[in-house]
């Protein structure tokens, strides 16, 4: 088994933040959050994915979504994003 696969196998993947055995906030394949840094490209990629997910949820919730004008959609998405 290649090194990458071994580490992935033994660490396991978690998509949500959790506390590791050392009580550190951790995510992914054992990445301690306190040690993480994001460059702008990665942050933008994450933002785009979050916006896609958010727009899908909004579309399922509001029947008028498909017929709304783009500016209305943009305001609704931004408001939902800002409110969390």
Give the location of each predicted region.
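Acidic, aromatic-lined catalytic clefts of primarily extracellular/periplasmic carbohydrate-active enzymes
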Residues: 1-83
